[in-house]
Amino acid sequence: MRKINTRSIINFDTYPKPPAVAKAVAQAVERYGGNPGRSGHKLSMRVSEKIFTVRQQAAKMFGAQTENVAFTANCTHALNMAIKGVMQYGGHMIISDHEHNAVARPVYALSKTRGVKYSIARTGETDSETVENFRRLITPETKCICCTVASNVTGRLMPYRELAALCKAHGICFIADGAQACGLLKLSLSDGFNFLCTAGHKALYGPTGTGLLISDGEYSLSTIIEGGTGATSALLEQTPFLPEKLESGTINTVGIIGLGEGLTFVRQKTPAVIKAHEEKLCKQLYEQLSDIDKIKFYEADQKKVPILSFNIGDIPSAEIASYLSEKGFALRGGLQCAAVTHTTLGTIEQGTVRFSPSAFSTPQQVTALSRTIKIFAANN
């Protein structure tokens, strides 16, 4: 819990971070002033070693070769790199009906600028039905399936292993959006991902402005950004060496060093323990509110990561979130940057209020939140 303008804020979004993350960020600003991979002086060498260590951490966590881990600005950046790097001109790709705009918008843009066709697969009542819906959309032109591992709106899990097997059987690239799942599920390239994209600031507990593009090395990406890499600098052609090829320009050394401590936190605590803790809090909130008729939960009965999305009658979700903010709770209202998902849920006009606890959330905070929601529901 933190204080803003002397008021306590119980945050159920992307804060707080482990103390070691904040300490690492401060130390990075003070001690690691060099540009990694750009010079031979001690400052540059020291920060290069630090960045390499974090890259190794991420590679070990997700079962990748170290050179196949690229640092990005966020998950959106990583997804754009993967999608646009695979789908250059023409062809067909498939996405799910639970995608974030980080997937939907690049795909839509490619349909307007590169002649890429796309289809949206409907999620079914069962995993097998969902996979079958994807399978039916595959054509001889299909090059890629891009699917979230877990919805950022409701937490619903997609059958990612089965979709990976489907892609492999048809020789199709599989790109996964792991932003809402990495750090909560023990995801690995061994699950069948060709590209796993994720954010550093969510369940990996790193700073904002950090992300990861993790590859199994089967597909070579064309670049969407070219520039200085510190490698083959005498050539105008972008370096072919990884990860430098995908990391043009000065990278976010401060954020990456902080991310390293976030990865350490997750590894030591374990995704399973973190997930179990958050699931208990979601169950607690659901049980405390489920007897109120005017409160509607979305996909609460599905296999999912620990998220609850709800509405109160026909009240705009932004109004509910604003009220909760005034009472000291930070929950996300609106569309959560996921118009495709809200179209699927039938909430494109109202949005939803999203409860997304963390490893630092407590049962006492959830009880206080549920009481506040009950008061609002009773008076509106």
Q: What name fits each language-model region?
A:
Residues 1-380:
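Pyridoxal 5′-phosphate
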